[in-house]
Amino acid sequence: MKTTLPISLDWSTEEVIDVVHFFQAIEQAYDQGIAREDLLGKYRRFKEIVPSKSEEKQLFRAYEQENDVSCYQTIKKAREEMEEHIQM
């Protein structure tokens, strides 16, 4: 399955890789689940790259339209629940 990922040409190669890993973690939460701390760690790195809330929303929206997932709901669940494993 071909997935389109929202990336910026302003990001370094390392930043692109880290953003891809974040979006893969979102997918993993929907597929087989992911360790809560792993997901939140990838989100923290994502926020270092994309500190702007409006840019985050744009990237989430672009990704969600292509992949039928909710980045916001996934992160919200990881923050609110104390379970070690997040499954959407």
UniProtKB/Swiss-Prot annotation:
Source species, domain of life: Bacteria
SUPFAM superfamilies on file: BH2638-like
Cross-referenced Pfam families: UPF0223 (PF05256)
Sequence similarity: Belongs to the UPF0223 family.
Protein name per the record: UPF0223 protein BH2638
Organism: Halalkalibacterium halodurans (strain ATCC BAA-125 / DSM 18197 / FERM 7344 / JCM 9153 / C-125)
Taxonomic lineage of the native organism: Bacteria, Bacillati, Bacillota, Bacilli, Bacillales
